[in-house]
């Protein structure tokens, strides 16, 4: 009876890793669409919101994993590895969001291939 209280009762870490990876893919696809449609102001705003939404969902998963990690005695793999993995995954989502925000902040436009090739280095 006492031993059962030590076993993890909630949270499947691997399922949460998969959910987080799905949010990263969503953010990456939205960022890709943002870059491809950057000249369209309405689409740019829409895709920026999609990137932000996916990143915020990833943050919620990260916080949930860390909360469960601190309340679970037995974990399927080393708790430091779980902590490092989910935080590195969250860094990826953060960097995608940072890239989208930087493009908006500096009003970076989509240069044509010819402009990129002909510009001085």
Can you describe what each PLM-predicted range is?
Residues 1-119:
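Cytosolic, long alpha-helical scaffolding segments
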